[in-house]
């Protein structure tokens, strides 16, 4: 059987290789580290953890990340198996001994008889079945090859992430639905008004807020005029924001009948309408500062954030436009993408998309049928966001969170609602595995 090529030996590529080889599919795994260095990595080990040693919450009953952990364990994930073996104390979080973890993943893949590891840089995309899992620091030559394949505007080289707020945490007694000048259907934006005193206090807080540092390899990341950090714009002058992302013109506050002094707009971020993006609020403020300062905005005093803002060097494609529900490139279905280059954010999210890419590719190679995971599961919710549910015109990397799951129809307290979503996800994944003959047999054989 012709081997599957996997480009990139990070978490996604390593997981995809394991899923394929475990189903008796030969793999050629290409990783340039060992021959060439990257600005971020310090070793040539596969699945090296670059920033943190934490896989975040391991609580499967009330945290979306913990639900994803549990699902991956159930699916026979190599990354989760090795993480559990190299766990270090971290309360309810899953943290690992990063050196032991990467060493163990490397040894497991090196010693698998169906996996060949090639220490070389790939400058072009092979014609054979290939999974591209090259990560946020994709080499320039491979990025050029991806651009040639997908189109000039399909690949981004840095992210400019604005915070995302859960819709049900916005105070609609203060905020209101309206598009500027009443364009659109009237429900395209949620608006939060500020009077002069509130605006000046917010502006001062932005300037004084503690900023995060760039990693060494990110220090040359450019600020483009269209996605300047909100605090950098604020530093240009007291009224810069009022003529930019906080422009109030064309917005009538129902409580006063007038335009506010300043306004923050939130735009719907997913098809379910559960997540709303703070328009133009990309930022390098530290996370705790973002929560404190953005809760100064009227209507967001009790805001719960599905994602906080940031700016990083990060290569990722416009997956909702380019990929089908099986992570295949629509225009060339022998090519799949996996990991952070698809626009998922986080170690475990990257590994989970690698897991799915490996399973889907194995099914193709063995001429078997397998459906995509149910949207009620964490795997299905993340996959659905990447491939179809996210706004393709404003696509930015996303962590797993309960805002990606279909909402619970009945009204319940937040804690109970999360527990209900977690339980629903467990049942949905179990049913999916039991009904998919290919999954049922191949997971048992691992």
Curated annotation (Swiss-Prot):
Gene3D superfamilies the UniProt entry points to: FAD/NAD(P)-binding domain (3.50.50.60)
GO BP term, pick one: tRNA methylation
Residues annotated to bind FAD: 8-13
Cofactor(s) it depends on: FAD
Enzyme class: transferase
Protein name: Methylenetetrahydrofolate--tRNA-(uracil-5-)-methyltransferase TrmFO
Known role: Catalyzes the folate-dependent formation of 5-methyl-uridine at position 54 (M-5-U54) in all tRNAs.
Catalytic activity line of the entry: uridine(54) in tRNA + (6R)-5,10-methylene-5,6,7,8-tetrahydrofolate + NADH + H(+) = 5-methyluridine(54) in tRNA + (6S)-5,6,7,8-tetrahydrofolate + NAD(+); uridine(54) in tRNA + (6R)-5,10-methylene-5,6,7,8-tetrahydrofolate + NADPH + H(+) = 5-methyluridine(54) in tRNA + (6S)-5,6,7,8-tetrahydrofolate + NADP(+)
InterPro entries per record: FAD/NAD-bd_sf (IPR036188), MnmG-rel (IPR002218), MnmG-rel_CS (IPR020595), MnmG_N (IPR040131), TrmFO (IPR004417)
SUPFAM superfamilies named in the record: FAD/NAD(P)-binding domain
Similarity-based family: Belongs to the MnmG family. TrmFO subfamily.
Organism for this UniProt entry: Zymomonas mobilis subsp. mobilis (strain ATCC 31821 / ZM4 / CP4)
PANTHER family registered for this protein in UniProt: GLUCOSE INHIBITED DIVISION PROTEIN A (PTHR11806), METHYLENETETRAHYDROFOLATE--TRNA-(URACIL-5-)-METHYLTRANSFERASE TRMFO (PTHR11806:SF2)
Disulfide bridge map: none
Compartments reported by the entry: Cytoplasm
PROSITE patterns: GIDA_2
Catalytic activity, EC: 2.1.1.74
Keywords for this protein: Cytoplasm, FAD, Flavoprotein, Methyltransferase, NAD, NADP, Transferase, tRNA processing
Primary site of residence: cytoplasm
GO CC terms: cytosol
Pfam family, one: GIDA
Example GO molecular function: flavin adenine dinucleotide binding
């Amino acid at each position: 059987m012709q081997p599957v090529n996997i480009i990139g030996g990070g978490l996604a590529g390593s997981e995809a290789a394991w899923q394929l080889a475990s189903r008796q599919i030969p793999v050629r795994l290409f990783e340039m580290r060992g021959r060439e260095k990257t600005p971020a990595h310090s070793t040539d080990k596969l699945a090296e953890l670059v920033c943190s040693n934490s896989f975040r919450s391991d609580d499967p009953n009330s945290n979306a990340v913990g639900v994803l952990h549990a699902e991956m364990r159930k699916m026979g994930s190599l990354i989760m198996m090795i993480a559990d073996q190299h766990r270090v104390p971290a309360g309810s979080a899953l943290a690992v001994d990063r050196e032991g973890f990467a060493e163990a993943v490397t040894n497991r893949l090196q010693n698998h008889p169906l996996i060949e590891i090639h220490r070389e840089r790939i400058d072009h995309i092979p014609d054979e079945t290939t999974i591209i899992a090259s990560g946020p620091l994709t080499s320039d030559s491979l990025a050029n090859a991806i651009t040639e394949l997908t189109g000039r505007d399909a690949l981004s080289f840095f992210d400019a992430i604005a915070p995302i707020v859960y819709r049900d945490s916005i105070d609609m007694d203060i905020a209101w639905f309206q598009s500027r000048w009443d364009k659109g259907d009237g429900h395209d934006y949620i608006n939060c008004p500020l009077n002069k005193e509130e605006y000046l206090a917010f502006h001062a807080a932005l300037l004084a807020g503690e900023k995060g540092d760039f990693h060494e390899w990110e220090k040359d990341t450019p600020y483009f005029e269209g996605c300047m950090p909100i605090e950098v714009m604020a530093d240009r002058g007291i009224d810069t924001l009022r003529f930019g992302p906080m422009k109030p013109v064309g917005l009538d506050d129902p409580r006063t009948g007038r335009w506010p002094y300043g306004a923050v707009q939130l735009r719907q971020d997913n098809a379910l309408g559960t997540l709303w993006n703070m328009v133009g609020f990309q930022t390098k403020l530290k996370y705790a500062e973002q929560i404190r300062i953005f809760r100064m905005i009227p209507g967001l005093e009790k805001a719960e954030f599905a994602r906080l803002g940031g700016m990083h060097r990060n290569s990722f494609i416009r997956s909702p436009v380019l990929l089908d529900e099986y992570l295949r490139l629509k225009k060339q279905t022998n090519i799949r993408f996996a990991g952070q280059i698809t626009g998922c954010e986080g170690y475990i999210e990257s590994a989970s998309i690698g897991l799915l890419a490996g399973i889907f590719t194995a099914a193709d190679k063995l001429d078997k049928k397998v459906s995509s995971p149910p949207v009620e599961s964490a795997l299905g919710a993340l996959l659905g966001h990447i491939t179809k549910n996210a706004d393709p015109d404003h696509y930015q990397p996303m962590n797993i969170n309960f805002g990606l799951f279909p909402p619970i129809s009945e009204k319940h307290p937040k804690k109970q609602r999360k527990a209900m979503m977690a339980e629903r996800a467990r049942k949905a994944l179990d049913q999916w595995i039991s009904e998919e003959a290919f999954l049922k047999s191949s997971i048992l054989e691992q």
